[in-house]
Amino acid sequence: DHNGWSDFKGEKRSNDTHQSQTDPEALLYRKGKGREAKLYHSGHALMENRNGLLVALTAGPANGHAERNATCAMIRHVRKRHWFVPATLGEDAGFRGKQHASELAELGVVQHIAGHKGRKPKGWTASQRCRKRIEQIFGWVKEVAGLARTRFIQRWKTKLYLLAAGATYNLLRMKNLGLAA
């Protein structure tokens, strides 16, 4: 047609062939097998298990390796900034991989993967019970803080809003735990 619109039915779409006109940093990403690819930025969080407080939060590109890379980067950041390194890290099955496990081992962190059939390290069951809290954080950030559909163009703006939402979540969590004075 004359205005350049077309449907892409039957055409292969990838980040090489398609780019957002409004936000070039947003990438096509498929959240699961058989699901459609949409433009996303990805948010990553690191939570301590004892109280369910966020320790680190960041936004990055939406691709298959962003979560693994962000995890190690956040652990390094927390170690450098707060002199704190988590002893264990509860992760879902998407984090399974020898390279990621060896990177975590170099950082001194034991990986606890959900649904892992092999030998379970000490504290695995408790770590998996705490994993529900991280999902609650993401649910809160999407529904209450409004990041299910971000209205910000450029990743740094999305990251700033994500950090503000994370700080707000921590304040509410501390209030509910009775830690805030």
Task: List where the protein language model places each region.
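Polybasic low-complexity intrinsically disordered regions
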Residues: 1-105, 166-169, 174-175
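Short, small-residue-rich loop/turn micro-motifs
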Residues: 49-51, 115, 145
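Short hydrophobic/aromatic-enriched beta-strand-loop microsegments
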Residues: 107-115
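Short, charged, surface-exposed secondary-structure boundary motifs
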Residues: 119-125
